[in-house]
């Protein structure tokens, strides 16, 4: 018969029994279950976190097999949110999982964040509008929000709290205006994706070993991704979720970040005062934009 304290007893030593109880009572919201989100959810479940709000509107496909938790021959065409819910419940039958199978929207955002201790961002890289809305609401509600993006065979992490630099101030996104043409709106979107990538990963370690840059197509909303980066992202992010919940251990908060790249044997702590307005970031933005323009031609 399942017993929570027996199931997670091997955590004790790294955690105290009181801390394990605290994790049992913790609620996390996970936005997006493709890519890193499934891994984040499962690692949190194995830490003993027992309350989840999870959101994804997509189903598994063959193209997910190389990297996504839950993707296998038996789950093709099945809702990602259902598969991850089932996986969490098989790890911890006492867990509570609220499944937002239609995804996150401005209409259900407050419900998604209700009672949440930490928000885990794993939305699709191209879902900027709802990502911005979630981070904005988290700041208003005082909910710590954390993102760890897989970058090649490494991961880059940022934490936003009530006392850190805000998500909007850090990334410096540009909003399209009603007067903009369709071409201008597309360009603004592409530029904002670049801002997000260089903001999450200021050191851009992954650029040194990308073998075929023609596979990076922002306008087609398609970028390469491999499993090692996903697994590393889950380890880094969930370790910091633990620190946020238990309020121990040093936190690296925006405009500071952390990038670990297993391929390059590098661990880099980044610091970008003023976020993407920092001169280094402006230089990186212009460089990547020029490379993409050259690639398109």
Model-predicted segments: where are they?
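A conserved mid-domain beta-alpha-beta active-site/ligand-binding segment of alpha/beta enzyme cores
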Residues: 167-229
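Phosphate-binding loop/pocket of nucleotide- and phosphate-handling active sites
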Residues: 1-14, 243-297
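A short, basic/flexible loop-to-alpha-helix module at the beginning of a structural domain
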Residues: 2-28, 223
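A structured beta-alpha segment of the ubiquitous adenosine-cofactor-binding alpha/beta core
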Residues: 77, 81-118, 122-131
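ADP-ribose/adenylate-binding Rossmann-like module
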Residues: 118-161
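Hydrophobic/small residue at the entry helix of a nucleotide-binding pocket
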Residues: 36-37
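Mid-domain beta-loop-alpha active-site segment that forms a flexible
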Residues: 222-245
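Glycine-rich phosphate-binding loop and adjoining beta1-alpha1-beta2 segment
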Residues: 49-92
């Amino acid at each position: 018969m399942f017993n929570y304290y027996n199931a997670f007893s091997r955590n004790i030593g790294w955690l105290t029994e009181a801390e394990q109880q605290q994790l049992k009572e913790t609620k996390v919201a996970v936005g997006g279950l493709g890519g890193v989100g499934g891994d984040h959810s499962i690692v949190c479940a194995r830490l003993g976190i027992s309350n989840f709000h999870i959101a994804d509107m997509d189903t598994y496909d063959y193209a997910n097999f190389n990297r996504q938790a839950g993707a296998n021959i038996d789950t093709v065409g099945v809702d990602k949110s259902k598969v991850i819910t089932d996986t969490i419940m098989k790890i911890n039958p006492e867990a509570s999982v609220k499944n937002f199978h239609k995804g996150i929207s401005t209409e259900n955002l407050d419900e998604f964040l209700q009672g949440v201790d930490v928000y885990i961002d794993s939305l699709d890289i191209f879902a900027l509008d709802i990502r911005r809305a979630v981070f904005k609401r988290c700041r208003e509600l005082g909910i710590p929000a954390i993102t760890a993006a897989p970058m090649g065979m490494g991961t880059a992490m940022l934490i936003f709290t009530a006392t850190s630099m805000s998500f909007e101030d850090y990334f410096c996104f540009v909003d399209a205006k009603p007067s903009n043409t369709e071409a201008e709106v597309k360009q603004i979107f592409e530029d904002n994706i670049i801002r997000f990538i260089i903001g999450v990963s200021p050191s851009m370690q992954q650029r040194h070993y990308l073998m075929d840059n023609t596979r990076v197509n922002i306008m087609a909303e398609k970028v390469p991704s491999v499993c090692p980066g996903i697994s590393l992202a889950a380890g880094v992010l969930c370790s910091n979720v633990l620190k946020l919940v238990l309020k121990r251990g040093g936190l690296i908060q925006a405009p500071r970040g952390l990038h670990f790249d297993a391929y390059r044997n590098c661990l880099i702590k980044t610091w970008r005062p003023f976020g993407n307005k920092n001169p280094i970031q402006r230089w990186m933005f212009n460089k990547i934009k020029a490379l993409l323009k050259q690639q398109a031609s």
